[in-house]
Amino acid sequence: MNENLFAPFITPTVLGISVLPLIMIFPCLLFSTSNRWVPNRLIALQLWLVRLITKQMMMMHNKQGRMWTLMLITLIIFIASTNLLGLLPYTFTPTTQLSMNMGMAIPLWMGTVLMGFRNKPKASLAHFLPQGTPTPLIPMLIIIETISLFIQPLALAVRLTANITAGHLLIHLIGSATLALSSISLTVSTITFTILFLLTILEFAVALIQAYVFTLLVSLYLHDNT
């Protein structure tokens, strides 16, 4: 029986009902809460990370753009949590689904664009035509800039999906090779297991970096329209 490499990326169901919403809610349980006046070390670390990310992302925004702070911080925590969740055994990574990533990218991108056309219509329209463009090239550049604008949410979603899926496939392939070689050559299987271990550590970094990149690009789109 041939093994399907993409089986881990199929949305899990129970009795024909998708359990994806339950999986997406689970990361919330990973963040501890406390009723004490003085937080413990884990909560203090979480607060420090949130403040650091907030400072890095929102320092370039004006007062209007900083109204999105809570949404962007929630977004990066959610994406990072779901990415890391998929690295646990017998789990599912929601961000490997292009439909879910498009569902996040399109509303956020559309919100920034609509805000720009509402608050700065002239500046938003000026993005379609760079200053100093020769007259014969004006129609072509307007078409190109329009296409590039509408490609932004697709690029956001595809980038996140491709990077997370590629890493999981590599882990799956190297893990299968390690298991197959364990009965043939212990030395070679040890080498492949070491590669698998290092790749898993790298995937933890990729999961966090992709969450940061996704949110940072949304923040840049917001900055261009505020």
Curated annotation (Swiss-Prot):
Major subcellular location class: mitochondrion
Family annotation (CDD domains): ATP-synt_Fo_a_6
Protein name listed in UniProt: ATP synthase F(0) complex subunit a
Organism: Ornithorhynchus anatinus (Duckbill platypus)
Quaternary structure annotation from Swiss-Prot or TrEMBL: Component of the ATP synthase complex composed at least of ATP5F1A/subunit alpha, ATP5F1B/subunit beta, ATP5MC1/subunit c (homooctomer), MT-ATP6/subunit a, MT-ATP8/subunit 8, ATP5ME/subunit e, ATP5MF/subunit f, ATP5MG/subunit g, ATP5MK/subunit k, ATP5MJ/subunit j, ATP5F1C/subunit gamma, ATP5F1D/subunit delta, ATP5F1E/subunit epsilon, ATP5PF/subunit F6, ATP5PB/subunit b, ATP5PD/subunit d, ATP5PO/subunit OSCP.
Name of the gene this protein is made from: MT-ATP6
TM helices/strands, residue ranges: 6-26, 68-88, 97-117, 138-158, 164-184, 193-213
One term under GO cellular component: proton-transporting ATP synthase complex
Family: Belongs to the ATPase A chain family.
GO MF, one example: proton-transporting ATP synthase activity, rotational mechanism
Compartments in which it is found: Mitochondrion inner membrane
Entry keyword annotation includes Mitochondrion: yes
